[in-house]
Regions:
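Bacterial N-terminal signal peptides that target proteins for export
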Residues: 1-8
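Cleavable N-terminal signal peptides
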Residues: 9-10, 20
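Sequence context surrounding c-type heme c attachment/ligation sites in exported
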Residues: 23-32, 36, 80-196
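N-terminal secretory signal peptides
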Residues: 23-86
């Protein structure tokens, strides 16, 4: 019975907090960080993701993708991330980035908020350090420029190795960073997963 109560509380918390932003221009960066923390505390792993999956950069070679109840529901109804054409307003997807010692080094988030930015499918983009300090928030051009590669999936990439960035595209976005050799191996092993 206790497990059922906890599950109901988790679902209500995720739905209520996400729903609160579903029909607005979006929360403050600090309020969004609180939403991210809920997903972190509940280990709300996105369908298709796994803990400490390969990341593309050597500075953060491991990642974990999280999603709130609305995003997970959208993914499941579509039959997988690759089949999603539009996420529900209030959907929140998060990428945690970890260093080689599996310590959290950064967090990025995308929140779907109606009326926020129709030209970019109403996604609020955000980047935080591990403590929640805001590094970027809003209509972040560099984020949007990369995510537009998967516009047909409503700007959300599937976790690797389901989808991988081409090396040339990766280098254009991360020109001052080193590519994770294990990620390059995945590109060679799964050429069909490289975004075109």
């Amino acid at each position: 019975m206790l497990k059922l109560k906890i599950a109901v509380l988790f679902t209500v918390t995720c739905l209520f907090s996400s729903w609160a932003w579903a029909h607005t221009a979006g929360p403050s960066p600090e309020a969004l960080w609180k939403e991210v923390q809920i997903l972190q505390k509940t280990h709300a792993i996105m369908p298709g993701s796994t803990p400490f999956q390969l990341g593309s950069r050597t500075v953060d070679p491991y990642t974990v993708d999280l999603a709130n109840t609305l995003a997970i529901s959208t993914i499941k109804k579509a039959g997988g991330i690759l089949k999603v054409t539009r996420y529900s307003n209030g959907s929140l997807v998060v990428k945690e980035n970890y260093n080689a010692h599996k310590q959290l080094v950064g967090v990025t988030a995308m929140l779907k908020a109606a009326k926020y930015d129709p030209s970019d499918r109403n996604w609020i983009m955000a980047a935080y350090d591990p403590t929640g300090k805001v590094l970027a928030y809003g209509k972040v051009g560099s984020c949007i420029a990369c995510h537009v590669l998967v516009r047909h999936q409503d700007l959300v990439f599937a976790p690797p190795p389901t989808q991988l960035l081409p090396i040339t595209t990766w280098k254009a976005f991360f020109s001052k960073q080193e590519m994770n050799p294990a990620y390059v191996t995945q590109i060679q092993k799964h050429p069909e997963a490289v975004v075109q």
